Amino acid sequence: MQQEKELVKQKAKELLLDLLSIYTPSKNETNATKFFEKISNEFNLKLEILPDSNSFILGEGEILLASHVDTVPGYIEPKIENEVIYGRGAVDAKGPLISMIIAAWLLNEKGIKVMVSGLADEESTSIGAKELTLKNFNFKHIIVGEPSNGTDIVVEYRGSIQLDIMCESTPEHSSSAKSNLIVDISKKIIEVYKQPENYDKPSIVPTIIRAGESYNVTPAKLYLHFDVRYAINNKRDDLINEIKDKFQECGLKIVDETPPVKVSINNPVVKSLTRALLKQNIKPRLVRKAGTSDMNILQKITTSIATYGPGNSMLEHTNQEKITLDEIYIGVKTYMLAIEELWQKS
């Protein structure tokens, strides 16, 4: 057992440092092509690259380990200190992805067929997950790899609506202007704004505003973007109509949308992950997350789905991303135990 653990940790160190050295912000996933070709050859896992999103699919089978290869922008030089690995994506989500790749390799060596994906664009508009749902893959079970502290099983995510608003007005000299588009729209923003408070209450948050071209002329045009988040028990149309009513004189456009997801705590993936953690004397927690993930998209394929992964979720998107080799090992072990159970029951 100790020998297996050291083998996994050594392989995880090698692969994760290699992958962290490759800068893959969203839409730049092709930078990792040679890495996945090497994995395919070394671990004898068939490689398929989805043509539209440049997502990477390894292996075969009806069980999918799905993580993502893209990261938020901002390269961090990878390093290792005392079995702690630092780098952009160490937590979100190259650490979980490496755990999944190693688990898939070891499972396939045992004759248990499992696929693993390094999906593209999860940090943006999830074009990788969306392309996967359009392919003829038939997955009975999906485990989504995101950092969940190595103990948490995510069974619910909120949905999101990305909304562009374009407003126009007559420009005037600022010294004698009777109206001002910035002032008028700012009042409406304050009226419609819903601060993120708790999971069950929707949030409407302005994230971008642009207007004006000259120091002494009021703006003729204004661009505004809202990031709307809502739980499965909130009414999507009511939120959109509330914003439309407030900005009646402006043009509105939904530029991206992700539905909320909530799965049964009794579905096979949740139950197998729970038992996998208990077998390691780790107390599992069922949690819900305020953001979104590829699970929101992949729920279209199967209801036997949940999210789990190694890594401290508080470090996501920060410049302090780090993960320990022990965390990755627990991730590998959990994925393997869960899939072995799912395989036996299939």
Swiss-Prot record:
Disulfide bonds: none
Metabolic or biological pathway: Amino-acid biosynthesis; L-lysine biosynthesis via AAA pathway; L-lysine from L-alpha-aminoadipate (Thermus route): step 5/5; Amino-acid biosynthesis; L-arginine biosynthesis
UniProt KW keywords: Amino-acid biosynthesis, Arginine biosynthesis, Cobalt, Cytoplasm, Hydrolase, Lysine biosynthesis, Metal-binding, Zinc
Active site, UniProt feature: 70, 122 (proton acceptor)
GO biological process: arginine biosynthetic process via ornithine; L-arginine biosynthetic process; lysine biosynthetic process via aminoadipic acid
Residues the entry annotates as binding Zn(2+) 2: 92, 123, 317
CDD domains: M20_ArgE_LysK (cd05653)
Reported cofactor(s): Zn(2+); Co(2+)
InterPro entries: ArgE/DapE_CS, Bact_exopeptidase_dim_dom, LysK, Peptidase_M20, Peptidase_M20_dimer, Peptidase_M20A
Chief location of this protein within or outside the cell: cytoplasm
Top EC group: hydrolase
Binding site for Zn(2+) 1: 68, 92, 146
Catalytic reaction(s) noted: [amino-group carrier protein]-C-terminal-gamma-(L-lysyl)-L-glutamate + H2O = [amino-group carrier protein]-C-terminal-L-glutamate + L-lysine; [amino-group carrier protein]-C-terminal-gamma-(L-ornithyl)-L-glutamate + H2O = [amino-group carrier protein]-C-terminal-L-glutamate + L-ornithine
Cellular compartment(s): Cytoplasm
Domain of life: Archaea
UniProt cofactor note: Binds 2 Zn(2+) or Co(2+) ions per subunit.
Gene Ontology molecular function terms on file: cobalt ion binding; hydrolase activity, acting on carbon-nitrogen (but not peptide) bonds, in linear amides; zinc ion binding
Gene Ontology cellular component terms for the protein in this record: cytoplasm
SUPFAM superfamilies named in the record: Bacterial exopeptidase dimerisation domain, Zn-dependent exopeptidases
Catalytic activity, EC: 3.5.1.130, 3.5.1.132
Gene3D superfamilies in the record: 3.30.70.360, Zn peptidases (3.40.630.10)
Entry function: Catalyzes the release of L-lysine from [LysW]-gamma-L-lysine and the release of L-ornithine from [LysW]-L-ornithine.
Family, per entry: Belongs to the peptidase M20A family. LysK subfamily.
Protein name: [LysW]-lysine/[LysW]-ornithine hydrolase
Organism field: Saccharolobus islandicus (strain L.S.2.15 / Lassen #1)
